[in-house]
Regions:
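Conserved N-terminal catalytic/coupling substructures associated with nucleotide/phosphate chemistry
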Residues: 1-151
Length: 151
């Protein structure tokens, strides 16, 4: 994926991992991304589960207006800065996500959703769990993004 400049503020050890994940969103690269986590950053957010569409739109707008980023669903950052990798119950259909938010965001706000399902993994915490990752792209030409409808 082109335009990953929004991750330049990340710690060096995380930059390469994020870059690889965005270039090739594979199970292995996602696992390495989770293993290398140092906590939430301006461009990376973790959600224990999918949030209601109006809250999701607010998150997406904030991230888009800050230069793009990632929301991970199925991972929770705890108060002690450790992580819970419980996953989400079901993979949410991309058409449903699009339908839920389309009335709130401009078509200029570009995003992609990736699915990660681990039936087995060498990283035990991920076994039998499902995750989704939303990548909100950096589109500086269209900033500021605003909700198209009151949420």
């Amino acid at each position: 994926m082109k335009g990953v400049e929004y991750f330049m503020k990340l710690p060096d050890q995380l930059k390469d991992i994020v870059y690889r994940l965005l270039q090739e969103p594979t199970l292995d690269n996602f696992r390495n991304f989770l293993k290398g986590q140092t906590g939430e950053h301006n461009s990376i957010d973790f959600k224990e589960k999918w949030i209601e569409p109006t809250k999701l739109v607010k998150e997406m707008l904030a991230i888009a207006n800050s230069g793009g980023g990632i929301i991970i669903f199925g991972v929770k950052e705890k108060e002690d800065k450790s992580f819970s990798y419980d996953g989400i119950e079901e993979i949410v259909d991309k058409a449903k996500i699009s339908n839920d938010i389309k009335n709130y965001i401009s078509t200029e706000l570009k995003y992609e959703v990736y699915d990660f399902v681990y039936d087995s993994s060498e990283y035990e915490k991920l076994q039998n769990h499902k995750y989704q990752m939303m990548v909100i792209k950096d589109c500086p030409r269209f900033i500021p993004f605003m909700s198209m409808k009151e949420s």
